[in-house]
From Swiss-Prot:
<keyword id="KW-0793">Thylakoid</keyword>
<keyword id="KW-0934">Plastid</keyword>
<dbReference type="Pfam" id="PF05969">
    <property type="entry name" value="PSII_Ycf12"/>
</dbReference>
<comment type="subunit">
    <text>PSII is composed of 1 copy each of membrane proteins PsbA, PsbB, PsbC, PsbD, PsbE, PsbF, PsbH, PsbI, PsbJ, PsbK, PsbL, PsbM, PsbT, PsbX, PsbY, PsbZ, Psb30/Ycf12, peripheral proteins of the oxygen-evolving complex and a large number of cofactors. It forms dimeric complexes.</text>
</comment>
<keyword id="KW-0150">Chloroplast</keyword>
<keyword id="KW-0604">Photosystem II</keyword>
<dbReference type="GO" id="GO:0009535">
    <property type="term" value="C:chloroplast thylakoid membrane"/>
</dbReference>
<keyword id="KW-0472">Membrane</keyword>
<keyword id="KW-0602">Photosynthesis</keyword>
<dbReference type="InterPro" id="IPR010284">
    <property type="entry name" value="PSII_Ycf12_core-subunit"/>
</dbReference>
<keyword id="KW-1133">Transmembrane helix</keyword>
<feature type="transmembrane region" description="Helical">
    <location>
        <begin position="5"/>
        <end position="25"/>
    </location>
</feature>
<comment type="function">
    <text>A core subunit of photosystem II (PSII), probably helps stabilize the reaction center.</text>
</comment>
<protein>
    <recommendedName>
        <fullName>Photosystem II reaction center protein Psb30</fullName>
    </recommendedName>
</protein>
<dbReference type="GO" id="GO:0015979">
    <property type="term" value="P:photosynthesis"/>
</dbReference>
<keyword id="KW-0812">Transmembrane</keyword>
<dbReference type="GO" id="GO:0009523">
    <property type="term" value="C:photosystem II"/>
</dbReference>
Amino acid sequence: MNLEIVFQLTALLFVVAAGPLVIVLLASRGGNL
């Protein structure tokens, strides 16, 4: 496998995982949106 492909997959996984995580953090910190 190419290192560039691995990097792109890692970045994609990071974005997919960070999306809901940021929403949960904002919801828990700010209370109700």
